[in-house]
């Protein structure tokens, strides 16, 4: 597809009438979400596979061009691990969490703000001057508190790792007002010592930012189809779930999924109407979630009578 300032390579076997049906299906969602803010947590395989990176950038450009305001928050676990290994710095994990020493924090900061952010900004800006990179340090965007998780029943020191405790979204608001796509790296100053920077969980940071900017949706990309009621039974994929039901499930979730679902709960508690977990391994999965009637993945909503339903049982 060609247009002023951008070029997407789209290959499809759909007939012309089928293509028209796809566009018509998107119409009510284009109307509903016009002018709305969508916070997207960029992660998983979508940020390491070159084709998926390109698809993600195209999705962000598409959202902006049709009148939505995407805001991207990213981590960079695989890239951080690769750089630490290349520099001969040991990576240690406790309870599934990376122990971040001052030496490792320098690498985290460098990789997130100087590599992952710059690459994504470049991919988006290949379609026009839309994206602007910033970190949680910029303009006091995030403030974090050092984290001491309970591991094996004891508070455990995992170094310069924190949780976002406050958000000043002024810098992001200014970029959105200017028609830009903010791309936010998940590092933040320590609220007890602003000269110290903490590595913060990108899922939680995205949820906090979504609440602060009044986003209509939080969308978290991951490497599974969504939340399963009875993993590994693939037929137990949950299409929609109320936040209170999800809150009760949190203690029993496996370690990889729990922080993502905790982020969904945090977003809903903060007033975001919808939070989604979708499979970022599938090209253009964000567009499928937002602009199709069935949607994909798992959607979390305020309860208000909403019962848990199996996938696609809308």
UniProtKB/Swiss-Prot annotation:
Keywords: Amino-acid biosynthesis, Arginine biosynthesis, ATP-binding, Cytoplasm, Kinase, Nucleotide-binding, Transferase
Family note: Belongs to the acetylglutamate kinase family. ArgB subfamily.
Residues annotated as site: Transition state stabilizer: 41, 260
Residues holding substrate: 76-77, 98, 199
GO molecular function, one term: acetylglutamate kinase activity
InterPro entries: AceGlu_kinase-like_sf, AcgluKinase_fam, ArgB, Asp/Glu/Uridylate_kinase, Glu/AcGlu_kinase, NAGK-C
Subcellular location: Cytoplasm
The enzyme's E.C. designation: 2.7.2.8
Lineage: Bacteria, Bacillati, Actinomycetota, Actinomycetes, Bifidobacteriales
A Gene Ontology BP annotation from the UniProt entry: L-arginine biosynthetic process
NCBIfam families: argB (TIGR00761)
Protein known as: Acetylglutamate kinase
Catalytic activity: N-acetyl-L-glutamate + ATP = N-acetyl-L-glutamyl 5-phosphate + ADP
GO CC list: cytoplasm
Record-annotated membrane-spanning stretches: none
Record keyword Ribosomal protein present: no
Job description of the protein: Catalyzes the ATP-dependent phosphorylation of N-acetyl-L-glutamate.
UniProt entry tagged with the keyword Amino-acid biosynthesis: yes
Pathway(s) the chain acts in: Amino-acid biosynthesis; L-arginine biosynthesis; N(2)-acetyl-L-ornithine from L-glutamate: step 2/4
């Amino acid at each position: 597809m060609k247009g002023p300032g951008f070029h997407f390579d789209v290959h499809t076997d759909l007939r012309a009438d089928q293509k028209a049906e796809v566009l018509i299906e998107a119409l009510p969602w284009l109307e509903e979400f016009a002018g709305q803010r969508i916070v997207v947590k960029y992660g998983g395989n979508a940020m390491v596979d070159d084709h998926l990176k390109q698809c993600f950038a195209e999705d962000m450009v598409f959202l902006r061009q049709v009148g939505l305001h995407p805001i991207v928050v990213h981590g960079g676990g695989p890239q951080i691990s690769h750089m630490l290994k290349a520099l001969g710095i040991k990576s240690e994990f406790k309870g599934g969490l990376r122990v971040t020493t001052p030496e490792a924090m320098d690498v985290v900061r460098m990789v997130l703000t100087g590599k992952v952010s710059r690459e994504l900004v470049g991919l988006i800006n290949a379609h026009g001057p839309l994206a602007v990179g910033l970190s949680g340090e910029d303009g006091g965007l995030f403030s974090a508190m050092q984290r001491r998780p309970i591991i094996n029943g004891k508070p455990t020191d995992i170094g310069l790792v924190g949780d976002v405790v406050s958000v000043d979204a002024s810098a992001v608001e200014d970029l959105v007002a200017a028609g830009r796509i903010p791309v936010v790296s998940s590092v933040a100053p320590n609220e007890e010592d602003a000269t110290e920077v903490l590595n913060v969980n990108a899922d939680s940071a995205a949820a906090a930012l979504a609440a602060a900017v009044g986003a209509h949706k939080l969308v978290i990309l991951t490497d599974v189809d969504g939340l399963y009621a009875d993993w590994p039974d693939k037929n137990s994929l949950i299409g929609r779930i109320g936040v209170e039901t999800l809150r009760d499930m949190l203690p029993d979730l496996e370690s990889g999924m729990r922080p993502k679902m905790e982020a969904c709960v945090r977003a809903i508690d903060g007033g975001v109407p919808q939070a989604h977990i979708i499979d970022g391994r599938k090209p253009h999965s964000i567009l499928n979630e937002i602009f199709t009637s069935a949607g994909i993945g798992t959607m979390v909503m305020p309860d208000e009578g909403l019962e848990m339903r199996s996938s696609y049982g809308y």
